[in-house]
């Protein structure tokens, strides 16, 4: 029986190796010398998801390094977030800390969180640390990559514009998607963002020649379960054959540290396939939960919040991830990101910060969904940088402009009718 919230399985991918400056873009070998020493420490304080670790001997582990300890017989990964004085680091736990006690031994891995990448991840479900949670045993024959890396150099990036056909007419006509671009699905609660992504998976991923990575960030376990079984039924995932999709989940009940990092785990897997010359589809549902988890972590670390309670590093955190989602001369990553809009307010800092990184935006309207029209795409609110006659062609561009003009006139007449009805 498939359970997203099952515990970490033994034999999950983790390896210690020497730290490489700047982390670079190269693929790393998992080999490590048998006698390599790990910096040892012990747990000093546990306050929810925040764990302080004391190192009385040796140097402190760098920021973003992964530390490992055991909690009730299971591996627990901690990520270094702050240095407190000369001997203590403050960490964020990637799993629950219930049962963790002071004095427990902690080892510095010498690396950021390392996750498995490569063909062996296809058809499997992993958590933020790359451990399988589909109860199908360990993921073997893989190499490991750090979830924190630098984006590709400008000279490696490609600017070629090509349309990605989705099969959804309102999108393909009025706000077409770019192959290798970043696409945002904006909408409030219950307007159909997840269903829209599932439709895109059905239309694109099944006919897509490359691989897909689906990352569930802070969403419902039930939706992940339904998606997994639906992919099995449609043949995207084959338990006894070649699958075309890898799934990474950090669901709603996970600690904020896991929800803040799980998107990077999925992105790291997608980057590997891209650098191997593949065209990759990366689905992230929901990017708002990434921001929300970041604000929780920021509050736990004692940082003063900025507007509406978000972390002061909101723009930096979002930019660091979005800049890695790009197309290079080797391959492409086409990213489709669902963006929850709190209270249907598009000026909220979280969706507003996401806007600036996107090539196309599809706005899902509550008013249209209330009419029973699905997908509830707002044809006037959705935009794309590809809507240019030099890219889509003169005929396509003129048709789209006429459609939008007609819809805008209809909307204006609706307002006039409402005013006259009120006067009468």
Curated annotation (Swiss-Prot):
Keyword field: ATP synthesis, ATP-binding, CF(1), Hydrogen ion transport, Ion transport, Membrane, Mitochondrion, Mitochondrion inner membrane, Nucleotide-binding, Transit peptide, Translocase, Transport
Gene Ontology biological process: proton motive force-driven mitochondrial ATP synthesis
Pfam families for the chain: ATP-synt_ab, ATP-synt_ab_N
SUPFAM superfamilies in UniProt: C-terminal domain of alpha and beta subunits of F1 ATP synthase, N-terminal domain of alpha and beta subunits of F1 ATP synthase, P-loop containing nucleoside triphosphate hydrolases
Transit peptide: first to last position: 1-60
Disulfide bonds: none
Localization: Mitochondrion; Mitochondrion inner membrane
Substrates-to-products reaction catalysed: ATP + H2O + 4 H(+)(in) = ADP + phosphate + 5 H(+)(out)
Subunit-structure text: F-type ATPases have 2 components, CF(1) - the catalytic core - and CF(0) - the membrane proton channel. CF(1) has five subunits: alpha(3), beta(3), gamma(1), delta(1), epsilon(1). CF(0) has three main subunits: a, b and c.
Function: ATP synthase subunit beta; part of the gene cluster that mediates the biosynthesis of citreoviridin, an inhibitor of the of F1-ATPase beta-subunit. Mitochondrial membrane ATP synthase (F(1)F(0) ATP synthase or Complex V) produces ATP from ADP in the presence of a proton gradient across the membrane which is generated by electron transport complexes of the respiratory chain. Whereas ctvA to ctvD constitute the core biosynthetic gene cluster, ctvE acts as a self-resistance gene.
The protein's name: ATP synthase subunit beta, mitochondrial
Source organism of this protein record: Aspergillus terreus (strain NIH 2624 / FGSC A1156)
Gene expressing this chain: ctvE
């Amino acid at each position: 029986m498939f359970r997203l919230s099952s515990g970490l399985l033994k034999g999950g991918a983790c390896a210690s190796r020497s730290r490489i400056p700047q982390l670079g873009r190269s693929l790393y070998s998992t080999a490590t010398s048998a006698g390599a020493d790990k910096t040892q420490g012990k747990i000093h304080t546990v306050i929810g998801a925040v764990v302080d670790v004391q190192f009385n001997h040796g140097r402190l582990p760098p920021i973003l390094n992964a530390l490992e300890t055991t909690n009730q017989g299971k591996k627990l990964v901690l990520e270094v977030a702050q240095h407190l004085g000369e001997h203590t680091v403050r960490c964020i736990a990637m799993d629950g800390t219930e049962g963790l006690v002071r004095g427990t031994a902690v080892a510095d891995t010498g690396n950021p969180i390392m996750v498995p990448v490569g063909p062996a991840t296809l058809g499997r479900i992993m958590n933020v640390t790359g451990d399988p949670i589909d109860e199908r045993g360990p993921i073997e024959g893989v190499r490991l990559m750090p979830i924190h890396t630098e984006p590709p150099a400008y000279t490696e990036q490609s600017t070629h514009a090509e349309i990605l056909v989705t099969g959804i007419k309102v999108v393909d006509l009025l706000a077409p998607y770019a192959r290798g671009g970043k696409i945002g699905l904006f909408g409030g609660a219950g307007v159909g963002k997840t269903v829209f992504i599932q439709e895109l998976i059905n239309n694109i991923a099944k006919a897509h020649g490359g691989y897909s990575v689906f990352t569930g960030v802070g969403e419902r376990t039930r939706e992940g379960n339904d998606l997994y079984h639906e992919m099995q039924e449609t043949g995207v995932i084959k338990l006894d054959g070649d699958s075309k999709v890898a799934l990474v989940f950090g669901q709603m009940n996970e600690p904020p540290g896991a929800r803040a990092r799980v998107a990077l785990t999925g992105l790291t897997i997608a980057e590997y396939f891209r650098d191997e010359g593949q065209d990759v589809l990366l689905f992230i549902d929901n990017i708002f939960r990434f921001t929300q988890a970041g604000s929780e972590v920021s509050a736990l670390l004692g940082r003063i919040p900025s507007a509406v309670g978000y972390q002061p590093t909101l723009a930096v955190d979002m930019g660091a991830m979005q800049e890695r989602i790009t197309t290079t001369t080797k391959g492409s990553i086409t990213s489709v990101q669902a963006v929850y809009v709190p209270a249907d307010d598009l000026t909220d800092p979280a969706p507003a910060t996401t806007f600036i990184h996107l090539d196309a935006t599809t706005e899902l309207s509550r008013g249209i969904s209330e009419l029973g029209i699905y997908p509830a795409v707002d044809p006037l609110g959705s935009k794309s940088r590809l809507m240019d006659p030099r890219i889509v062609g003169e005929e396509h561009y003129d048709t789209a402009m006429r459609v939008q003009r007609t819809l805008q006139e209809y909307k204006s007449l609706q307002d006039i009718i409402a005013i006259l009805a009120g006067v009468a």
